[in-house]
């Protein structure tokens, strides 16, 4: 049976992590996001270099899970179609079925992303064909 990848996208505070964690627990699947690789103990630390390394670790973790034949979820901002395609195309090459969900709620973000940055992300956000919008 083909593994499945659920890509959950949205701006900070849209509910990506919350829904991803709930789905992962309910179905017993792995969940990855860049943020989990930016934790230093209990502290979230974001720097450009750390963010780049975290993105690579997240991508590699997702692909390794799919290669092992297991379903998984990845939740990140994925603002552009290109960002979604990186995961979707690589997953499809591994024979995985890919689904994309976009979160559009505004719960407030836990990482204190500045309002100007959030506004820029929202303006730059691109639709993705076939995505489920929640």
Predicted regions: what they are:
Residues 1-3, 65-66:
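Phosphate-binding P-loop
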Residues 2-9, 14-17, 22, 26, ...:
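Conserved GTP-binding G-domain of TRAFAC-class P-loop NTPases and closely related GTPase folds
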Residues 8-11, 34, 74-77:
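Short His-Asn-centered micro-motif
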Residues 18-70, 104-111:
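Conserved substrate/cofactor phosphate-moiety recognition/catalytic segment
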Residues 41, 82-83, 129-132:
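Solvent-exposed, flexible loop/coil residues
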Residues 52-102:
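Glycine-rich phosphate-binding loop used to anchor ATP phosphates in small-molecule kinases
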């Amino acid at each position: 049976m083909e593994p499945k990848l659920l890509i959950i996208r949205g701006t900070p505070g849209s509910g990506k992590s919350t829904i991803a964690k709930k789905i992962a627990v309910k179905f017993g699947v792995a969940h990855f996001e860049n943020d989990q690789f930016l934790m230093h103990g209990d502290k979230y630390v974001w720097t450009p270099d750390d963010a780049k390394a975290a993105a690579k670790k997240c991508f590699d973790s997702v692909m390794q899970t799919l290669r092992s034949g297991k379903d998984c979820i990845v939740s990140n901002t994925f603002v552009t179609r290109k960002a979604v395609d990186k995961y979707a195309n690589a997953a499809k090459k591994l024979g995985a079925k890919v689904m994309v969900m976009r979160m559009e709620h505004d719960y407030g973000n836990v990482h204190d992303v500045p309002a100007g940055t959030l506004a820029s992300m929202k303006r730059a956000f691109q639709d993705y064909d076939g995505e489920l919008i929640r």
